[in-house]
């Protein structure tokens, strides 16, 4: 059984089409870590990205909260008052980590005539350094910090107010914010578990009992 997801504001319109896509091949063969598998797909469910990561704990939310899911291609936001999710306050923007990667590549070429592989830039965003020339890393840090500031600008456009809200950040962009933006740990909670969303999909499928016992 497959439990997968789509960006928050795309789920309503694209769920059925994506579900059909996931089920187009019921018998699948593949290799993973030098082991061969043959599986039979018995069903599929599609859930909102980002929300899946907080689904197991949302019933413990109190006060005003905002979820920010920063993936590779999109940034999704969702508001919740106590444990009640407000579906009217759900937004998706094409402002994921890849936009930051492209901005860094452009800055390095423009300012230093240097090219850097995308994987090294992703590692820099994740760890804060990749051990290259100091001036290059300085330019990368400035660009990443500017991207992080723009993320919070977009959050404010969607109603984020750090004076009254807690912010929950999930997705790969969480490490970026942690490394390149001053985070108040009592107001901004970053979930750095890269499997959090996948675990959330499994949790929601189990809660809704849609798997029929399939694992």
State what each model feature region is.
Residues 112-116:
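Short, basic interhelical loop/turn and adjoining N-cap
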Residues 1-65, 84-99, 119-215:
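Nucleotide/phosphate-binding catalytic cleft detector across ATP-hydrolyzing
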Residues 75-79:
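Short beta-strand scaffold segments in enzyme catalytic cores
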């Amino acid at each position: 059984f497959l439990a997968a997801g789509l960006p928050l504001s795309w789920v309503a319109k694209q769920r059925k089409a994506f579900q059909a896509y996931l089920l187009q091949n019921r018998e699948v063969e593949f290799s993973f870590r030098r082991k061969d598998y043959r599986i039979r797909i018995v069903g599929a469910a599609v859930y909102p990205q980002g929300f899946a990561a907080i689904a197991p704990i949302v019933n413990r939310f109190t006060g005003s909260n905002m979820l920010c899911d920063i993936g590779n291609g999109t940034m999704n936001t969702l508001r919740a008052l106590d444990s009640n999710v407000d579906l009217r306050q759900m937004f998706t923007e094409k402002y994921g980590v890849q936009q930051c990667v492209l901005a860094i590549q452009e800055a390095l070429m423009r300012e230093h005539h240097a090219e850097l592989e995308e994987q090294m830039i992703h590692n820099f965003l994740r760890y804060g350094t990749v051990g290259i020339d100091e001036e290059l890393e300085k330019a990368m840090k400035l660009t990443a910090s500017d991207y992080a500031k723009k993320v919070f600008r977009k959050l404010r456009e969607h109603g984020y107010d750090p004076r009254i809200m807690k912010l929950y950040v999930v997705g790969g962009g969480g490490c970026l914010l942690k490394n390149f933006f001053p985070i108040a740990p009592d107001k901004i909670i970053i979930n750095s578990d890269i499997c959090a969303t996948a675990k959330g999909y499994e949790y929601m499928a189990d809660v809704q009992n849609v798997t029929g016992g399939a694992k």
